[in-house]
Amino acid sequence: MRKKVFVSGCFDMLHSGHISFLENAATYGDVYVGLGSDQTLFELKGRRPVNDENERLYMMKAINCVKSAFISQGSGILDFSEEIKRLRPDIFVVNQDGNIPQKQKLCEEQAIEYVILNRLPHEDLQIRSTTTLREIDKMPYRIDLAGGWLDQPFVSKHHQGCVITMSIAPTLEFNERSGMST
């Protein structure tokens, strides 16, 4: 009988680095994936996911090397702790980024082998992470509260990028309606 291998993560913006990690984990046995919920992702990373939990679950289940996947019901960094007790995996596989003392301790308490994988890309591909993908797509912006388009050439010499221009003016209606004094 093949061993049960557990992995956890958000797996938002699914990319070749995720697939390579899952394929490497599958060399240890059948892979079971605990996905962080949208709420957990927001709590841990301070942002909403690009793909919601149902879409991430659908994509994860479609990967050939994944035996089963589920959305973890807990919260925080060990959001999967109840599920791991029910699943009773033989091995918990993490990459270097996911290697934290809390996971090691949980594995010691549950008598689960703890394996740390290096981040290795599939042959002929570069190392990929969600963070690097987000950096590629990052659009620099600045807010111009001063001169509007007149200062654009000067400001662009120092920091290029999109500009959000806004005008700030008192709104008496808001102040009167909310009972605030002016």
Please report, for each region that a protein language model flagged, where it lies by residue.
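ATP-binding N-lobe of GHMP and related small-molecule kinases
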Residues: 135-182
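Nucleotidyltransferase catalytic core that binds NTPs
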Residues: 1-134
